[in-house]
UniProtKB/Swiss-Prot annotation:
UniProt keyword annotations, A-Z: Cytoplasm, Flavoprotein, FMN, Isomerase, Isoprene biosynthesis, Magnesium, Metal-binding, NADP
Listed cofactors: FMN; NADPH; Mg(2+)
The organism of origin for this protein: Picrophilus torridus (strain ATCC 700027 / DSM 9790 / JCM 10055 / NBRC 100828 / KAW 2/3)
Stored Pfam families: FMN_dh
Binding site for substrate: 5-6, 92-94, 159
Gene Ontology terms describing biological process: isoprenoid biosynthetic process
Stated name of the protein: Isopentenyl-diphosphate delta-isomerase
Length: 349
């Protein structure tokens, strides 16, 4: 069942080492400004994303839904999004179509005033697999379930290749995406492997409004599926999960590749407000956080709130030390890049 798989994903993400071997945000070093000429309390962290005003350039990335544990997590995350006036996504919502009894694990966020809500479906479910693809009515139901402002379509074909229940068809996804983008504000999102420039051009041609890079550097779904396979004693899937543990395009490089005129969300391996600042300096409008919030969200709102306060404090300190009075000025702060990220930035030159 999908619900059981989602519960497994939460437990593994919380309790096992499922991150890639290298975090590429560490390959960016920021030039320090010793004389900032900025007062800390005057720093403006506000940002506008596709017409929506956020107090901070932060998106609570799509994580979960479909189980009672997920309901608790989504509730605490929604309270956090309301408190800080930032955007929030939910996990893949196909389960709510298959089992209407899970709907409240997503719709719980409707109890809170969130500046922007992001519904979420998987790209593999846009085309026929062993079962039917999501219909237009299914997508409308999902979108309306949380009164969404945006529709995330997540691309997770690496995960689909690794997991036993994976959907392996992709032909026709862009055509269907183009149809959907005519009716919804679609955000294309990778889930840990990043988008290339070729991908970004295809997505923008299909009509997506923004790209969430979800690059290599943070949670590896190949790693998560490795641990699932280990529990099931599935030697072949264990081998595949281990082989592709570090597959993908680094998050910072993917931001550069996808910066083609429409907003970019930088996600994949963000750990703190310093990483967030680096994402913005590389061209992102928002930074997406998932793993850093998940465990706290399964505990209490106060724990998530404290974590978010630390992220924001880090961001503001970075802005202070780069003489950035606002987010626009932060985008122009100076930095250097180190290997191995530097080589990735040469790919399209």
């Amino acid at each position: 069942m999908i619900e059981n798989r989602k519960e497994e994903h939460i437990k593994i993400a919380e309790n096992e080492n499922v991150v890639s071997e290298h975090n590429f945000w560490d390959d960016i070093r920021i030039v320090h400004r010793a004389i900032p000429e900025v007062d800390f309390n005057d720093i403006d962290t506000g940002v506008k994303f596709l017409g929506k005003q956020f107090n901070y350039p932060i998106l609570i990335s799509s994580m979960t839904g479909g189980t009672e544990t997920a309901k608790i997590i989504n509730k605490n995350l929604a309270m956090t999004a309301e408190h800080f006036k930032i955007g929030m996504g939910v996990g893949s919502m196909r389960v709510a179509v298959k089992n209407k009894n899970t709907a409240d694990t997503f719709s719980v966020i409707n109890d809170y005033k969130i500046p922007a809500k992001f519904a979420n479906i998987g790209a593999p479910q846009l085309v026929r697999q062993d079962s039917d693809s999501l219909s237009d009515n299914d997508i409308e139901y999902i979108y309306n379930l949380i009164n969404a402002d945006f529709l995330i379509v997540h691309f997770n074909f690496l995960q689909e290749m690794v997991q036993p229940e994976g959907d392996r068809n992709s032909k026709g996804v862009i055509k269907r995406l183009k149809d959907i983008a005519g009716s919804y504000n679609v955000i294309a999102k990778e889930t840990g492997s990043g988008f290339s420039k070729e991908d970004a051009l295809s997505l923008l041609d299909a009509g997506v409004k923004a790209i969430d890079v979800g690059g290599l550097g943070g949670t590896s779904f190949a790693a998560i599926e490795y641990y699932r396979a280990q529990k099931a004693n599935d030697e072949i899937k264990m081998h595949t999960g281990k082989a592709f543990w570090n597959w993908g395009i680094p998050s910072p490089a993917s931001i550069k590749y996808c910066s083609l005129g429409e907003p970019v969300i930088g996600s994949g391996g963000l750990r703190n407000g310093l990483d967030l600042a680096k994402a913005i300096m590389f061209g992102a409008t928002l930074g997406g956080f998932a793993r850093e919030l998940l465990k706290d969200a399964n505990t209490s709102f106060d724990d998530v709130k404290r974590q978010m306060e630390m992220i924001i404090n880090d961001l503001k300190i970075t802005m202070m030390l780069t003489s950035s009075r606002n987010i626009d000025e932060l985008k122009h702060a100076r930095y250097i890049t180190l290997e191995p990220l530097r080589s990735w930035l040469e790919v399209y030159k």
